[in-house]
Amino acid sequence: MGKIIGIDLGTTNSCVAIMEHGKPVVIQNSEGGRTTPSIVAYTNKGERLVGQVAKNQMVTNPENTIYSIKRFMGRRFEEVASEIKMVPYKVEKGQNGDARVNISNIKKQMSPPEISAATLTKMKETAEAYLGEKVTEAVITVPAYFNDAQRQATKDAGKIAGLDVKRIVNEPTAAALAYGIEKKHEEIVAVYDLGGGTFDISILELGDGVFEVKSTNGDTHLGGDNFDDEIIKYLITEFKKDSAIDLSNDKMALQRLKEAAEKAKIELSGAQEASINLPFITADANGPKHLQYTLTRAKFEQMVDHLVQKTKEPCLKAIKDAGLKASDINEVILVGGSTRIPAIQKIVKEIFGQEPNKGVNPDEAVAIGAAIQGGILTGEAKDMVLLDVTPLSLGIETLGGVMTKLIERNTTIPTKKSQVFSTAADNQTSVDIKVLQGEREMASQNRVLGNFILDGIPAAPRGVPQIEVSFDIDANGIVHVSAKDMGTGKEQKIRIESSSGLSEEEIERMVKDAESHAEEDKKLKEGIEAKNIANSLIYQTEKSLKEYGEKITNQDKEAIENKIKELKDALEGSDISLLKSKTEELQQASYKIAEMMYKDAQASSPDQNNAQNNAGSESKEADYEVVDEDKK
């Protein structure tokens, strides 16, 4: 078995790690960063940018720069109304009811898994550059409170990126693995994970290499983005008061406000106030307008208090579901960049009655845990067992629109449960099995994961047929359901794929698109490198002509000038092979100047000249070898 990489596919940033010699290692990307912005952009030339380069052009290209796409993963369009208001790009309803992004620069509607796949591809390439070998397998993390559709969407993203996703792991569980890899004694830990777009709380029991999740809870609509949004709303309100100009419909201004808000939030974790200066934010008839405010930590904490308080209830529920009291918990581990906010650390202390443990890097712990899980699967991380849970209850709709639960939330996975049902009407020959996920009593109040029909049931009075419904949740938290007529033995099975999910055909098409993008990216890089070499050669040759042009024949000088012109013309076009051949031709022609420079250097150094003469023919042979090497 090859290497299995661990990927934290985050809302704001992503991170990749690998097990080496029994230890997890975080891999730096090509820009030298240990985390990569989860941002994908498309330029007006249709070029795809991923990571920091995409982030760098957000302000000037807001409608084609996609960030926080994780908030839309596996979601139906009607479920993301609040998320749509937070982003400048266009989110539309897809053909099958899911949320999709319309990217004007490439005139294409893209699914969230397809966009996330671009970030996963960057992570995959980062690992491949480090390892010097192809990577095809990964463990990818998701928020613990992700439902089945969101988990399936994450697996689809991995497939589109050319990765066989060996395991989907809950982020708090991964962080606990990172924390507990070298811990030998038994303890109960709480993982408080506040990322860019989601909040999770998990309670785990650690001991003797066993990591057992006791309970989990969370909010998939709460994260650092919401804190940024509060600052943005405040700045828009204050600026409108001062200048009577509303910035809320100016997409470029909003993008600048988002950057400034994120920066101010980060600054306020270490300072009591942050200055926000955005010159030329807009203009009116009187000229340009500048935005300048000072935000204090006290004001910020007042603005976000309702968000901070929203994390309290899930924590209390998780403690209760685990059958514990807050005082039973030995350590509280903070994960996610937003846990650096002092108000968050304060409420954690209030809930659990202790200072949180800050020994784990909140940006890297999840990827490290994913790499450890990869090591468990390959056998590199020995004597470790991970027992996770399903975050939400699963069941089916029964008579009267009631949800009948088969698997309760916080059940250890993998698991399988069966229950026998019957028909609701006389002579009923088929049953429609509607699969639900959630905690409400009525079916209509829970999420429909999918439905299927078991037909061919022999006509009989109601209540007579025996239909066994079985739920099977695998280690990834993905649901498989079957229904069997006990009388005839006829069985119908499905792997739940949300009605708003991607079809196999769509995934295959997206895989091919991703592969073609990889080829495009390679060609683009090759073209840029060829242009850089050509420009550098033109500059050096023109400089040398100025200095030594009088010392070569007019014929040679004219030939070099012609080759420079031909190379400049090739630079204007898009034919890379022509550019390379013209670069080679100028290189050959410029050797005449190199000869003159060499002779000049010899003439100006008599001692060196004598030494060269004494060296005899062997020295000349070496010179020719070096020139020959250059030609290669």
Swiss-Prot record:
Phosphothreonine PTM positions: 198
Record-linked Pfam families: HSP70
HAMAP family: DnaK
A molecular-function term among this protein's GO annotations: ATP-dependent protein folding chaperone
Induction notes from the record: By stress conditions e.g. heat shock.
Gene source species: Borrelia duttonii (strain Ly)
Ranges of Polar residues composition bias in the record: 602-617
Signal peptide: none
Protein name: Chaperone protein DnaK
